[in-house]
Amino acid sequence: MSAVLSTENGLILKLYIQPKASRDQIVGLHGDELKVAITAPPVDGQANTHLVKFIAKQFRVAKSQVIIEKGELGRHKQIKVINPQQIPPEVTILLE
């Protein structure tokens, strides 16, 4: 499976998370996953909350449309984005 998979109602993203980064950004490919750097620390779910907020902003969807399907407690996550209004260029390249 590639880092980004298109489904009938959205996208499934396989992510590698880098917490406590200097800024929030989609870095690029990391093996067969998309690397995302976020500023939040991996403490008490702060990184997950921040990640959902960041992904929702990047894809212009509500936070409720970003679902962590796998990897709640680790760096390797699978996230579903339901009906994205916009797709960031870093992700568009992987869809082609």
Swiss-Prot record:
Pfam families: DUF167. Transmembrane segments: none annotated. GO terms for cellular component: cytoplasm. Belongs to the UPF0235 family. This is UPF0235 protein YPO0944/y3330/YP_3498. It comes from Yersinia pestis. The lineage of its organism: Bacteria, Pseudomonadati, Pseudomonadota, Gammaproteobacteria, Enterobacterales.
